[in-house]
Amino acid sequence: MSIRFQKAAALSNFSRYNPNSGRGFYESYFIRANHPKDPKAFWIRYTLFSPKSKPKDSIGELWVIYFDGAEVFSSKTEIPWSQCQFPRKQFSVQIGDSYINNVVAKGQSNHLQ
């Protein structure tokens, strides 16, 4: 893989959110995995939501979904913007204690239903 391609791929993951724009904004990053043999899967989504003309009301949302082969369990947690990071110069998203970057992802919920 060329260095040019690697740089373009990295840049494509940087957040595009500009809190000074006043425009509404929605951006998501996610990771999912399926068990290779059993009908099991999980999905974790890290989302930034900023309502139009109200950047002070921006929040981070952590969505967690788990399928055990018979049932689907899900949760959505809203986190205050003060506990979130969506940098524009690197791929390192954080929502509360959950995060995703080029190397690792962590997301958990104690509210699966």
Spans of model-derived segments:
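Targeting-peptide/extracellular-domain and disordered-appendage signature
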Residues: M1-Q113
